[in-house]
UniProtKB/Swiss-Prot annotation:
Residues 96-117 have a biased composition (Pro residues). It comes from the Viruses. The RNA-binding motif binds to the RxRE, a complex secondary structure consisting of four stem loops and a long stretch of stem structure, present in incompletely spliced viral pre-mRNAs. This region also contains the NLS which mediates nuclear localization. These overlapping functions prevent Rex bound to RxRE from undesirable return to the nucleus. When Rex binds the RxRE, the NLS becomes masked while the NES remains accessible. Residues 1-26, 90-182 are annotated as: Disordered. GO terms for molecular function: RNA binding. This is Protein Rex. Rex escorts unspliced gag-pro-pol and singly spliced env mRNAs out of the nucleus of infected cells. These mRNAs carry a recognition sequence called Rex responsive element (RxRE or XRE) located at the 3' region of the long terminal repeat (LTR). This function is essential since most HTLV proteins are translated from unspliced or partially spliced pre-mRNAs that cannot exit the nucleus by the pathway used by fully processed cellular mRNAs. Residues 127-150, 172-182 have a biased composition (Polar residues). Residues 57-71, 124-132 are annotated as: Homomultimerization. GO terms for cellular component: host cell cytoplasm; host cell nucleolus. The lineage of its organism: Viruses, Riboviria, Pararnavirae, Artverviricota, Revtraviricetes. It comes from Human T-cell leukemia virus 3 (strain Pyl43). It is found in: Host nucleus, Host nucleolus; Host cytoplasm. A motif (Nuclear localization signal, and RNA-binding (RxRE)) lies at residues 2-19. Residues 1-14 have a biased composition (Basic residues).
Length: 182
């Protein structure tokens, strides 16, 4: 039985298979038969800032840890070691943490003290007296004047104490609005 030869492909030897990357990118790399040298030529790149002569390696690429920060604290402040020791002493695991100190709750029986006196509302039809100069009229109608009559305190009255609902006008303001001019 005669031996038959396998036909070879008609492709010439110097033609390479097409690569997915551009040829210009491949042309400047050095290829060799060993895979280790190929990977070392393509993977490892110099790290640093480029300049005219080549690459200058930056300092932090080879350092295992960051350098210590310069001591810039003010002379009166404690160091971080002292602060951390103080914090560790106050937050020791042996004693249970104390609850945070809260402000004492306001009593239900004491009325809240107003920070400012409410202004007096005058009826629009009320006109100042004719014999007073305008400077005194302006000064006496000022809501911050000490001559304003304050609202009657509910604790001084003999009647039962009632609270004003939120949004409703206090009794002194509503009476001064609804009162007819003298």
């Amino acid at each position: 039985m005669p031996k038959t030869r396998k036909q070879r492909s008609r492709r010439p030897r110097n033609q390479r298979p097409s690569t997915p990357w551009p040829i210009s990118q491949v042309s400047d790399r050095a290829f060799s038969t060993g895979t280790l040298s190929t990977f070392s030529a393509t993977v490892y790149r110099p790290i640093g800032a480029p300049f005219l002569g080549g690459f200058v390696p930056l300092g932090y690429t080879a350092m295992p840890c960051w350098p210590r920060a310069p001591n810039i604290r003010l002379p009166g402040t404690p160091s971080m070691d002292a602060l951390s020791a103080q914090l560790y002493n106050t937050l020791s695991l042996g004693s249970p943490p104390s609850p945070p100190k809260e402000l004492p709750a306001p009593s239900r029986f004491s009325p809240p003290q107003p920070l400012l006196r409410p202004p007096r509302f005058l009826h629009p039809s009320s006109t100042p007296l004719k014999n007073t100069p305008p400077s005194e009229t302006i000064a006496s109608s000022s809501p911050w004047e000490s001559s304003c009559q304050p609202c009657p305190s509910p604790t001084l009255g003999s009647g039962p104490k009632t609270s004003t609902p939120y949004g409703a006008a206090p009794s002194c303001v509503s009476t001064s609005i609804s009162s007819p001019p003298p």
